Amino acid sequence: MSRTKKTRRITDIMPARKADKKPEQPKLSGGKNRKSTRYELDAKAREEKKKRKHKGLPTGSRNVDPAEQKKAAVKEVKDPRIGSRKKIPLMVEFVNKPEKGQIIKPVAMEEYKPHLSPELELEQLENNEILNQLLDEIEAGKTLSAKDQKFVDECLDRIDELMTELGIQDEDEDNGDALLRQFETMDINQFR
């Protein structure tokens, strides 16, 4: 069954709406050249004023320049981000989410080591004030913290590597080896 739009019919029971009433026209009696009375002119002016009042035109429509009309015709490009209904996550999680059963291995960062010539690096390590101060404390019999001891060990190991790379031999090591050999070969009975 098709639907039909219901219309409001004016009957005797219903009150008449303002829009349904037709304005009463004053009856003109007499000749064509007869002047309207003051009351007729007022009624006519009131009707015209009502018509003007309810036209619905925007204010100042008479004063619009044609150049401004062209500008108004060009639509401004709206930013598509404004007024979006799509929900945006506030916290980004699982940017590189692996497939099920797969694991993304973390990439190890390589430490950057400045490439100095071995001679320069050895000279810098030998002239390192902090290292020299820590070595003096060790010779004095003080105990170092774990962090300082690790630093001293790393520096001394690097010095040894650089010296073997450059072919430099420490004089103290030769004397120590000679003394060790002398001690091992010595006859202990001589000192009794």
From Swiss-Prot:
Keyword Phosphoprotein tagged: no
Keywords noted in UniProt: GTPase activation, Ribosome biogenesis
Compositionally skewed regions (Basic and acidic residues) per UniProt: 9-25, 37-48, 65-80
Endpoints of the signal sequence: none
Disulfide bonds, paired cysteine numbers: none
Residue numbers spanned by region Disordered: 1-80
GO molecular function: GTPase activator activity
GO annotation, biological process: ribosome biogenesis
Matching NCBIfam families: PRK05244.1-1
Entry similarity comment: Belongs to the YihI family.
Assembly notes: Interacts with Der.
HAMAP family in the cross-refs: GAP_YihI
Protein name as it appears in the record: Der GTPase-activating protein YihI
Source organism per UniProt: Actinobacillus pleuropneumoniae serotype 5b (strain L20)
Organism classification: Bacteria, Pseudomonadati, Pseudomonadota, Gammaproteobacteria, Pasteurellales
Gene that this sequence comes from: yihI
